[in-house]
């Protein structure tokens, strides 16, 4: 993903969730996705999809069973 795409994704997340705490980072050797953080906490990955000329982005978040027991 380009720096411009990363910035747009970050701005979108911050606007939708009414915060300024999202961070979007490039992945080291993978160009079709980025890492999403809220403050310092890793949340998941966003993948860029291109199907039949349509570009979209998919968010993938894993929630560990152990994390759910904390609540």
What feature does the model see in each segment?
Residues 1-71:
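Terminal leader/tail segments of proteins
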């Amino acid at each position: 993903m380009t720096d411009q795409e990363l910035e747009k994704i970050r701005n979108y997340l911050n606007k939708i969730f009414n915060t300024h705490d999202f961070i979007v980072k490039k992945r080291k050797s993978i160009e079709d996705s980025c890492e999403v953080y809220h403050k310092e906490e890793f949340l998941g990955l966003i993948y860029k999809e291109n199907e039949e000329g349509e570009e979209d982005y998919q968010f993938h978040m894993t929630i560990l069973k152990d994390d759910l027991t904390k609540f």
